[in-house]
């Protein structure tokens, strides 16, 4: 962001972004607290170098916000995708490492909210990381 890597000279025409300074730089495994709600951040490079997922426990729900790292698709969210692979910092190796790390964390989520697709609840939410990891392995050899 600070370097303006995705600025007007970027070959990625749909990612034009001027140089800017973030208010807060998110590190790995930081916790932000808002009125008693703890939001855990985990860097998951691969889709981009800056990909982050968020985890929170809200009431009885264990919620994972995946952004563009992976997301469900299909009418009922029965499939998963890792999305666009055209970013300058896309790395299948880093994505594999990130998936392995997330899978090993065993967050046992019951709600997944992503940057695309429908929200997934219950068993489908719990299984989405595995389904997306499998999609990644089969489509990024």
Which ranges hold each PLM region?
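Acidic/polar short surface loop at catalytic or gating sites that assists cofactor/ion binding
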Residues: 1-21
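Exposed alpha-helical structural elements
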Residues: 7, 127-128
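Metallo-beta-lactamase
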Residues: 15-20, 31, 38-45, 49-127, ...
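Short acidic-hydrophobic, aromatic-tinged amphipathic segments that line or gate anion-handling sites
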Residues: 23-29
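A charged helix-plus-loop insertion that forms the helical arch/lid used to bind
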Residues: 132
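Short, flexible loop segments at boundaries between secondary-structure elements
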Residues: 137-141
């Amino acid at each position: 962001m600070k370097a303006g890597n995705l600025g007007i000279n970027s070959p990625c025409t749909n990612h034009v972004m001027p140089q800017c300074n973030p208010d807060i730089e998110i590190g790995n495994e930081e916790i932000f607290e808002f009125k008693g709600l703890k939001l855990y951040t985990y860097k998951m490079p691969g889709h981009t170098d800056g990909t982050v997922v968020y985890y929170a426990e809200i009431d009885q729900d264990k919620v994972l916000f995946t952004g563009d790292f992976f997301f469900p698709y299909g009418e009922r969210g029965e499939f998963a995708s890792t999305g666009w692979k055209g970013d300058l910092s896309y790395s299948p190796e880093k994505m594999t490492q990130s998936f392995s790390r997330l899978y090993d964390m065993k967050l046992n989520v019951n709600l997944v909210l992503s940057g695309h697709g429908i929200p997934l609840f219950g068993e489908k939410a719990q299984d989405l990381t595995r389904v997306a990891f499998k999609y990644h392995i089969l489509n990024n050899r």
